[in-house]
Design a protein with these regions (language model features):
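Core alpha-helical transmembrane segments of integral membrane proteins
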Residues: 115-189
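Generic secondary-structure signature for well-ordered alpha-helical cores
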Residues: 17, 21, 38-42, 90, ...
Length: 256
């Protein structure tokens, strides 16, 4: 019994952490924890999860209890990894495997799910920025300018992620860089509409997934977790606006 109890504790700690980091909803993370624990005949499960921390207390039929706490310091959206983790949780519930199998599976998911390389990310960033600039009414030249700035933006984002710069400061820097280059391009004649070029790139920074997940968390009853994620999305939005305002003040773009 205690062996199965340790299995459940180990799985919950690693599995839920990977899910939350990959962009899973709070309710989905907690539901997976409870299902896995039930598969290992855990008598009582108390789970508390927010965007930056997770706590789970497990109690077996003999009264033994284990509390696992994990601090979450980074978030990103990785749907491939999330799909594999969800599939693994279903296998765990069906088969109740030993600890070595679970550890190996989680390690394989971590190693086998790799990010796209930087050139591909820059290419996609350029295509998205250019497409949005034209979609919102910009000329073809505005789209080209937005695409070039999109490459620069991705390089800045990549650098801030590698150096682990504070999220709010990183968004201020990214927004300021995007807006400054956009103003400079238009002044040099490489583009017609500053706002369209800026909008095309700002769309890459908007925390749409975080905002959507926060609303879903609140609807599902996780008010605290939803509010924290909502506040995080609002702070990111304010940081983006701050970067634009600084650039506009320097280049005299406010009110034009």
């Amino acid at each position: 019994m205690f062996y199965g109890f340790k299995n459940a504790s180990h799985v919950c700690s690693r599995h839920r952490g990977k899910m939350l980091i990959s962009g899973a909803e709070i309710s989905r993370v907690e539901d997976s924890v409870k299902r896995i624990c039930n598969a290992y005949d855990v008598k009582r499960i108390d789970v508390f999860t927010i965007t930056s921390s997770m706590v789970a207390t497990l109690e077996d039929k003999d009264g033994n209890s284990i509390t696992e706490t994990r601090r979450i310091t980074k978030h990103h959206t990785d749907l491939t990894k999330l799909h594999k983790l969800n599939d693994l949780s279903r296998k765990i519930v069906r088969r109740v495997p030993d600890i070595h199998y679970i550890r190996n599976q989680i390690d394989e998911i971590e190693k086998g799910t790799k990010e796209y390389n930087l050139p591909i990310q820059c290419t996609v960033s350029a295509l998205i920025a250019g497409a949005f600039a034209i979609f919102f009414g910009g000329a073809f030249l505005d789209g080209i300018a937005a695409a070039l700035i999109g490459i620069v933006l991705k390089l800045i984002v990549y650098a801030t992620e590698k150096t682990q710069v504070n999220m709010i400061f990183a968004n201020v820097v990214c927004s300021f860089a995007v807006c400054s280059i956009a103003f400079a391009f238009v002044m040099l004649g490489f583009g017609y509409s500053t706002d369209k070029i800026i909008i095309g790139n700002i769309m890459l920074l908007i925390p749409g997934v975080a905002l959507t997940n926060s609303i879903r968390d609140m609807i599902s009853g996780d008010i605290m977790a939803g509010m924290l994620r909502f506040c995080e999305a609002c702070l990111v939005s304010l940081a983006i606006a701050a970067g634009y305002i600084i650039a506009a003040l320097i280049f005299g773009g406010i009110g034009k």
